């Protein structure tokens, strides 16, 4: 917590995103902020007096911003769904994340720049509530896929091993036809 406080209190705390990723920093006592631009894998968080946007490592949820047509088309192709089915899944992923973050949660970040078009910088993070990983929960419910920026986890788990675990969870969600997979033309392959 002291490390987090030092980073946040320094004049260049947000600037650290321009540098190589640093040590993992746990941010306890974060609060979810309702924002129109939030979706299943990217959202606004209040920590102390500061507001941040965090983007989940390892996963990609259906986009809610309909201006991102190329990404939405690629996601529709991957999941085997129509635009209408994609919109439904994007809303479900956003709702799930909103509900998940109503309970106390832990943000763990290295302040790695996740890019974005917002007024605030966006950083990659891992999010946990009661020891459960949000990214894993999204994939398990068919509300995201295993894809995206990866990192060695704070416990030392290799990124490729964690991604393999998420890919397996995704395959199980697809086979069970949950979430977006319920509407997929690919069936339970």
Task: Label each PLM-derived region with a short phrase.
Residues 1-7:
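Bacterial N-terminal signal peptides
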Residues 8-189:
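Small beta-barrel nucleic-acid-binding modules, primarily SNase/OB-fold domains
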């Amino acid at each position: 917590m002291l490390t987090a406080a030092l980073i946040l209190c320094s004049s260049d705390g947000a600037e650290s995103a321009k540098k190589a990723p640093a040590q993992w920093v746990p941010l306890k006592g974060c609060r979810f902020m309702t924002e129109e631009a939030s979706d299943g894998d990217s959202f606004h968080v209040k920590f102390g007096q500061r507001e941040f946007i965090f983007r989940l490592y390892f996963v990609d949820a259906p986009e809610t911003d309909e201006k991102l047509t190329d990404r939405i088309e690629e996601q529709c192709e991957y999941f085997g769904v129509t635009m209408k089915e994609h919109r439904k899944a994007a809303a479900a992923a956003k709702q799930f994340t909103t509900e998940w973050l109503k309970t106390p949660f832990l943000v763990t970040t290295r302040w790695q720049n996740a890019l974005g078009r917002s007024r605030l910088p966006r950083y990659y993070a891992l999010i946990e509530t009661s020891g459960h990983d949000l990214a894993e929960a999204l994939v398990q419910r068919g509300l995201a896929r295993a894809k995206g920026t990866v990192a060695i986890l704070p416990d030392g788990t290799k990124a490729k091993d964690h991604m393999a675990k998420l890919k397996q969870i995704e395959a199980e969600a697809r086979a069970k036809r949950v979430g977006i997979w319920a509407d997929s033309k690919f069936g339970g392959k």
